[in-house]
Amino acid sequence: MDNIMSAEYYLSLYTKYNSKNLDVFRNMLQAIEPSGNYHILHAYCGIKGLDERFVEELLHRGYSPNETDDDGNYPLHIASKINNNRIVAMLLTHGADPNACDKQHKTPLYYLSGTDDEVIERINLLVQYGAKINNSVDEEGCGPLLASTDPSERVFKKIMSIGFEARIVDKFGKNHIHRHLMSDNPKASTISWMMKLGISPSKPDHDGNTPLHIVCSKTVKNVDIINLLLPSTDVNKQNKFGDSPLTLLIKTLSPAHLINKLLSTSNVITDQTVNICIFYDRDDILEIINDKGKQYDSTDFKMAVEVGSIRCIKYLLDNDIICEDAMYYAVLSEYETMVDYLLFNHFSVDSVVNGNTCMSECVRLNNPVILSKLMLHNPTSETMYLTMKAIEKDKLDKSIIIPFIAYFVLMHPDFCKNRRYFTSYKRFVTDYVHEGVSYKVFDDYF
């Protein structure tokens, strides 16, 4: 047994020898009984350009064409993968099962590499020896036709002519056009003839993605494919994640002229489209949308402030669109550049929303940097009064604002002449500092 295994071992090494001699090979085989240890038949079926007589000798010696190697491959699968039709024919004539499935649940028909003539010859061979049509699906739920993501028109039509169904989808609901778009080099010409063969260019997959969704989500856009798919697809059609082909173009930072192409096919510009333009700071798209009749309002300005879209803020300002409480929402976002931009454009620091002020929100966020910027822009006495009320109501830490309030009172002596303001300020400070400190100075005002 050791001698048999040793002879097989040297026969496996012979696969790596460049100048193989059939007579030498036959002599080596004389000392061998198939053991299955080295998968000899598999190894020789995987040699490109090998004379099929080597495989024939192995088959005559008793090596089975219907055994798998350690990876679950059959000799017929291996020969199909490397496009050796002569070995494919040899295996089939010696009983290889054309419907055997490898670990990926693929039959030999799934492996269609080679020129059109070679692929068509292999298809004819497999079908001639009993390959079943529409009888297998791989791990992705694809039959051989659907698994071929980048077929030539001639091969595709050949596969269809022998009975394969073209109007099918994989387990994700993707049809041939979806899958072709996911290949390395999708082509408009391929999609064009697929459409002529009746494959839907607008069918959504199980996630709601049409082929146009897929092409619009790619980093590099194929304009020819977009032009081909546009007439049959609603650019506002949302997938289950809420994205449309139009919003996907915006999210992938596509050029304005391409987005305009999709906009030109739509009668409706949705609020979602506007919101995504603002989120990605696409002021150029806002301008295109505005030219098509879409009106903006303070809600759009507010969103631009919240997400920090400086270019969109500038565009809206130039078109006299503002939000009176913009500074408040800029503080909430803690985006200093936005705060600076609004201050530069003379937005008020006296915004009050639901009883909260810009300053009280700085205290809540523990942000002394933005607080100092706001205090330098002269909030009103009423604003400071409301700030103290909001801080006390929500029991916020006063330490961050006490120095600013003290300086404010010092610079605004009229503040303490208002009993309401003074009483609030006295209580605010008294509750903060240590017991025993005298506040008689306050009594001098009254």
From Swiss-Prot:
Lineage: Viruses, Varidnaviria, Bamfordvirae, Nucleocytoviricota, Pokkesviricetes
Gene designation per UniProt: OPG037
SUPFAM superfamilies to which the protein is assigned, alphabetical: Ankyrin repeat (SSF48403)
The family this protein is said to belong to: Belongs to the orthopoxvirus OPG037 protein family.
Subcellular localization: Host cytoplasm
Chief site of localization: host cell
Induction remark: Expressed in the early phase of the viral replicative cycle.
UniProt cross-references to InterPro entries, sorted A to Z: Ankyrin_rpt, Ankyrin_rpt-contain_sf
Source organism, top-level taxon: Viruses
Official protein name in the record: Inhibitor of Apoptosis OPG037
The entry's keywords: ANK repeat, Early protein, Host cytoplasm, Host-virus interaction, Modulation of host cell apoptosis by virus, Repeat
ANK repeat segments: 71-100, 104-135, 207-237, 241-271, 296-325, 327-351
Subunit record text: May interact with host caspase-9-Apaf-1 complex.
Gene Ontology cellular component list: host cell cytoplasm
Pfam families: Ank (PF00023), Ank_2 (PF12796)
A biological process term (GO) from this entry: symbiont-mediated perturbation of host apoptosis
